[in-house]
From Swiss-Prot:
GO terms for cellular component: cytoplasm. Catalyzes the NADPH-dependent reduction of L-glutamate 5-phosphate into L-glutamate 5-semialdehyde and phosphate. The product spontaneously undergoes cyclization to form 1-pyrroline-5-carboxylate. The gene is proA. It catalyses: L-glutamate 5-semialdehyde + phosphate + NADP(+) = L-glutamyl 5-phosphate + NADPH + H(+). The keyword ATP-binding does not apply. HAMAP family: ProA. This is Gamma-glutamyl phosphate reductase. GO terms for biological process: L-proline biosynthetic process. Belongs to the gamma-glutamyl phosphate reductase family. Its main location: cytoplasm. Keywords: Amino-acid biosynthesis, Cytoplasm, NADP, Oxidoreductase, Proline biosynthesis. It is found in: Cytoplasm. Pathway: Amino-acid biosynthesis; L-proline biosynthesis; L-glutamate 5-semialdehyde from L-glutamate: step 2/2. Its EC number is 1.2.1.41. It comes from Francisella philomiragia subsp. philomiragia (strain ATCC 25017 / CCUG 19701 / FSC 153 / O#319-036).
């Protein structure tokens, strides 16, 4: 099927879905939850094909981790779908209303965006998260995943479409671009006749390529050059715990720690202790000259390291003179995703939280919490790093827009 045909089908499916009531949408989602669990063996078989190809292509461990589905991860996907079903339906919600002096009533209500095109890389769970969020918020969605996850994505798409049709909804509510040629992406991001918004979920190169080609509004998500700043007033045991979690729990995700900033007054005491702990996880350290004085197995960082999202067990480290230098570095090199300060100083906490420009700013907690499920949104369609329309984890409400309904009785403007 051509991209144009997919766009036409999605537009029609969105019109039909806009008429679906909450009960029907929730029934579909509960059925999807059950179907994911019932078809776990089929999903894992298809996922194994992608994993075999990834290993043949010598892809990194972090990449393979993002690609891998397990029974536990399928269960987590199903739980996410259940959460989405349990959330209040935003469509038709009256955000505010008032009566005009001329007697008209004016209401602001939530409506679907329409047709969403989502382009993402190697995480197949996105197929289900994005599809479920789109359905609950009344949108049709066209997905274009990475070629490395094609078998898994097709399996998940098939399950989703079967459930939709079983409940009398169009299978075109969720479509997948199965042709992996790059030309199809260009066609997709210029299909402004049928698509209302593009959501790219991936690294800087993906977003840059789409920005250069797209003729459709875009919501940027994904790239996470996340920092943690260890202040001179930090509890060092707490700091080590936070850094280890943020860097090593799942290094291949966008909310993982990539760059560590350490106040010069504690670097000598803190860095050797941290290096011992990070060595247990085989984390490669790339440090500036000042930090190298206190590290035994680090290599000298290059200027490029401060702007790199490793998505792997690699960490850049820089010693800074004060909190102001830390904030300046973060606002220069960060991707406006998630940033953290570890400190027992109330004053420095407030300075950092107020002055760092990011979607999520933490005090004394791992950046790994920037996630739709952790924020209570169920699944997420992505983590927006821009400022317009949506910022941070994007759940159901972020996939809607506003519409004004004016009810009159013959009023005219004088």
């Amino acid at each position: 099927m051509s991209i144009v045909e997919m766009g036409k089908n999605a537009k029609q499916a969105a019109k039909e879905l806009a008429q679906a009531n909450t009960e029907l949408k929730n029934n579909v989602l509960h059925e999807l939850e059950k179907s994911l669990l019932d078809n776990a063996e089929y999903i894992l078989q298809q996922n194994q094909k992608d994993l075999d190809n990834a290993k043949k292509n010598n892809l990194s461990k972090a990449f393979v981790d993002r690609l891998t589905l397990t029974p536990a991860r399928i269960e987590s996907m199903a739980q996410g779908v259940r959460q989405i079903a349990d959330f209040a339906d935003p469509i038709g919600k009256i955000e505010k209303g008032f009566k005009h002096p001329k007697g008209m009533t004016i209401s602001q209500i939530r409506v679907p965006l329409g047709v969403i095109a989502m382009i993402f890389e190697s995480r197949p769970n996105v197929t289900i998260d994005a599809g479920a969020l789109a359905l609950k918020s009344g949108n049709a969605i066209i997905l274009r995943g990475g070629s490395d996850a094609l078998h898994t994505n097709i399996a998940l798409k098939n399950i989703f479409q079967e459930v939709c049709e079983k409940h009398g909804l169009s299978k075109n509510i969720v479509q997948l671009v199965e042709d992996i040629a790059r030309e199809r992406v260009t066609e997709l991001v210029t299909l402004d006749k049928y698509i209302d918004v593009i959501i790219p979920r991936g690294g800087k190169s993906l977003k840059k390529a789409i920005q250069q080609q797209a003729t459709i509004s875009m919501i940027e998500t994904g790239a996470g050059i996340c920092h943690t700043y260890i202040d001179e007033f930090a509890d060092l045991d707490k700091a080590i715990k936070i850094v280890i979690n943020a860097k090593t729990q799942r290094p291949g995700v966008c909310n993982a720690l990539e760059s560590l900033l350490v106040h010069q007054n504690i670097a000598e005491k803190f860095l050797p202790k941290l290096e011992i702990e990070l060595a247990k996880y085989n984390v490669e350290l790339r440090a500036d000259n000042e930090s190298l004085k206190y590290l035994g197995n680090a290599i000298l960082a290059t200027p490029e390291d401060w702007d790199t999202e490793y998505l792997d067990l690699v960490l850049s480290i820089k010693t800074v003179a004060n909190i102001n230098e830390a904030i300046e570095h973060i606002n220069t090199h960060g991707s406006m995703h998630s940033e953290c300060i570890v400190t027992e100083s109330y004053t420095n906490t407030e300075i950092f939280l107020n002055e760092v420009d990011a979607a999520a700013v933490y005090a004394n907690a791992s950046t790994r919490f920037t996630d739709g499920s952790e924020f209570g949104f169920g699944g997420e369609i992505g983590i927006s790093t821009q400022k317009l329309h949506a910022r941070g984890p994007m759940g159901i409400n972020e996939l809607t827009t506003l519409k004004y309904i004016i009810r009159g009785n013959g009023q005219v403007r004088g």
